[in-house]
């Protein structure tokens, strides 16, 4: 008659150990920072960007969802306010060395629900490193406005047309937009309405 061999206690994984594995945070490829800019009450003589505030830097999937669910939704901000998500260490300003020679892809929306969806899809694509040219991406800005909301994807090397077109095509697919256009930061510094350099 066969008998079962005794099982050593050390061979049985403890419930606590299993729970620890489940609770371990899922690290992202890099750190990201949320920024907030409220221009709803502009003051005369105050430089652009003076109301820009760094909010939170995160590096795990769990932190991202916690911040997004509680705070960073375009529907939760007032008109003329901006939310930004940029790679940690890069400020959402033209003057930042990583942004100085770059530009931005822009998509517009006349409905808040659309902006919310496009914003979330873009955030997930960025933190999930879904772009082949992810090293050329700085971050994204959601601008809530009275007449038309705007989403802008900032990149580093505006003159690298191949990289920008690759990013543009991918982003257009991600947010399901009909048309998006790309402008250089240098043009935006000189003209209020910078012309589009690339379009997809």
UniProtKB/Swiss-Prot annotation:
GO terms for molecular function: RNA 7-methylguanosine cap binding; translation initiation factor activity. One of its GO terms (cellular component) is eukaryotic translation initiation factor 4F complex. It comes from the Eukaryota. It is found in: Cytoplasm; Nucleus. Disulfide bonds join 99-138. PROSITE patterns: IF4E. GO terms for biological process: negative regulation of defense response to virus; regulation of translation; response to virus; translational initiation. It holds the Pfam family IF4E. Belongs to the eukaryotic initiation factor 4E family. PANTHER family: EUKARYOTIC TRANSLATION INITIATION FACTOR 4E RELATED, EUKARYOTIC TRANSLATION INITIATION FACTOR ISOFORM 4E-2. Displayed sequence is from cv. Heinz 1706 and cv. Ailsa Craig, and is associated with susceptibility to cucumber mosaic virus (CMV), tobacco mosaic virus (TMV) and plum pox virus (PPV). This is Eukaryotic translation initiation factor isoform 4E. It comes from Solanum lycopersicum (Tomato). The lineage of its organism: Eukaryota, Viridiplantae, Streptophyta, Embryophyta, Tracheophyta.
């Amino acid at each position: 008659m066969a008998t079962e061999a005794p099982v050593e206690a050390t061979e049985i994984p403890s419930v606590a150990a299993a729970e620890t594995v489940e609770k371990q945070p899922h690290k992202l490829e890099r750190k990201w920072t949320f920024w907030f800019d409220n221009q709803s009450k502009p003051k005369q003589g105050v430089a652009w960007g003076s109301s820009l505030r760094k909010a939170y830097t995160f590096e795990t999937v769990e932190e991202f969802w916690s911040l997004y669910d509680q705070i960073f939704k375009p529907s939760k901000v007032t008109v003329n306010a901006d939310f930004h998500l940029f790679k940690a260490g890069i400020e959402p300003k033209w003057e930042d060395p990583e942004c100085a020679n770059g530009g931005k892809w822009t998509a517009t929306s006349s409905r808040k629900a659309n902006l919310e969806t496009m914003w979330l899809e873009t955030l997930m694509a960025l933190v999930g490193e879904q772009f082949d040219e992810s090293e050329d991406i700085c971050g994204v800005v959601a601008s809530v406005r009275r007449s038309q909301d705007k989403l802008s994807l900032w990149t580093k090397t505006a003159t690298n047309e191949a990289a920008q077109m690759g990013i543009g095509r991918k982003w257009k697919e991600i947010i399901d937009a009909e048309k998006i256009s790309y402008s250089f930061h240098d043009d935006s510094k000189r003209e209020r309405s910078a012309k589009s350099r690339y379009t997809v």
